[in-house]
């Protein structure tokens, strides 16, 4: 039996998931990353996207995150997410609200760096909207 990964998914409101899994795919700022037990330590910011939790014998869990941070240590993976919702619960209306918030962030950006970051977030949300 393969070694399991300790995985914690935390939002500002609560601990959403804590357990041992086979693999987690996270939407890192530089691209998607598959994390398994024994992965090298790494920290990454998260872009809006889908976290996929894989566990042998169980359906794949897919969770939308609006951003946050991920840390891989020898103890496991911890994701601190700004906002999360299971993909099964995500509907077009909710995603449209997220897009509107991101659009406002673009308009309110105080400098070019913040505007670029907000535009990237908006682009990712629009891509996700096409999948719903």
Swiss-Prot record:
Matches recorded under InterPro entries: ATP_synth_F1_dsu/esu, ATP_synth_F1_dsu/esu_N, ATPsynth_dsu/esu_N
Taken from the UniProt entry, a GO cellular component term is: proton-transporting ATP synthase complex
Q: Which UniProt keywords apply?
A: ATP synthesis, Cell inner membrane, Cell membrane, CF(1), Hydrogen ion transport, Ion transport, Membrane, Transport
Q: How does it sit in the membrane?
A: Peripheral membrane protein
> What's one GO MF term for it?
proton-transporting ATP synthase activity, rotational mechanism
Top-level taxon: Bacteria
Name the CDD domains on file.
F1-ATPase_delta
Cross-referenced SUPFAM superfamilies, in alphabetical order?
A: Epsilon subunit of F1F0-ATP synthase N-terminal domain
The protein's matches in Pfam families, at most eight in alphabetical order, are given as: ATP-synt_DE_N
Subcellular location(s): the record lists: Cell inner membrane
Concerning its family, UniProt says: Belongs to the ATPase epsilon chain family.
Its quaternary organisation is: F-type ATPases have 2 components, CF(1) - the catalytic core - and CF(0) - the membrane proton channel. CF(1) has five subunits: alpha(3), beta(3), gamma(1), delta(1), epsilon(1). CF(0) has three main subunits: a, b and c.
Q: What does this protein do?
A: Produces ATP from ADP in the presence of a proton gradient across the membrane.
NCBIfam families assigned = ATP_synt_epsi, PRK00571.2-4, PRK13449.1
**What protein does this entry describe?**
ATP synthase epsilon chain
Species for this entry: Parvibaculum lavamentivorans (strain DS-1 / DSM 13023 / NCIMB 13966)
């Amino acid at each position: 039996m393969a070694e399991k990964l300790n995985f914690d998914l935390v939002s500002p409101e609560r601990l959403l998931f804590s357990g041992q899994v086979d693999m987690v795919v996270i939407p890192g700022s530089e691209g998607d990353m598959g994390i398994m037990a024994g992965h090298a330590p790494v920290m990454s910011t998260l872009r809006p996207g889908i976290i996929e939790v894989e566990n042998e014998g169980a359906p794949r869990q897919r969770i939308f995150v609006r951003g946050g941070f991920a840390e891989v240590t020898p103890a496991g993976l911890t994701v601190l997410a700004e906002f999360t919702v299971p993909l099964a619960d995500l509907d077009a209306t909710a995603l449209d609200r997220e897009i509107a918030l991101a659009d406002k962030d673009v308009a309110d950006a105080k400098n070019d760096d913040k505007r670029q970051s907000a535009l990237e977030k908006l682009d990712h949300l629009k891509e996700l909207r096409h999948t719903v």
